[in-house]
Amino acid sequence: PDFQLGPFQDPRHALAAWFSSPDNPFFATALVNRMWAHFLGRGLVDPIDDSRSTNPATNPELMAYLSDRFIQSGFNVKQLIRDICSTHAYQLQSQTTPLNATDHATFARFYPRRLSAEVLLDGISQVLDVPTVFPGGPGKFPAGTRAIELPDENVAVHFLDVFGRPGRNKACECERVSEATL
């Protein structure tokens, strides 16, 4: 986009305004694709960072519908989550049938996947009613701090490393390790 900036205007403000403008279709489709991938394990465009015209969505009508709804809602993420979770694809069971046993491209069923290391640790802590104590003491991480809230991988927690927490230098969630390394 061509920004008309005044002499003392910060170009970052103009860029941020353009990013979240309804006139910018890329922001909505990128966020819809990431949220879809978060809930269903794979984006409508896969890989999620490859949104070239030569790599179309598996369901372009659904992508357009969700993107339009997201823009019309004023970029309301809660509404986007409701829209994704109310789709037929999200509500499918994981049990295979002869028709969908080998289908991995069309969201014909739910594909079970492992919990992330942070979610697993938080779940165990909640079920056992024993809060996890993180290095640095209560001054740095007060009681009740969840693993999902940790700021970076510099907080040394062996459990998280063993169960696949990626380093922050990894740009893609696909770098998350899915096999336990016990």
Question: What kind of feature is each model-predicted range?
Answer:
Residues P1-G144, E149, V157-D161, P166-R176:
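Primarily short, surface-exposed interaction patches in extracytoplasmic proteins
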Residues E153:
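Catalytic cores of secreted/periplasmic lytic hydrolases that degrade extracellular macromolecules
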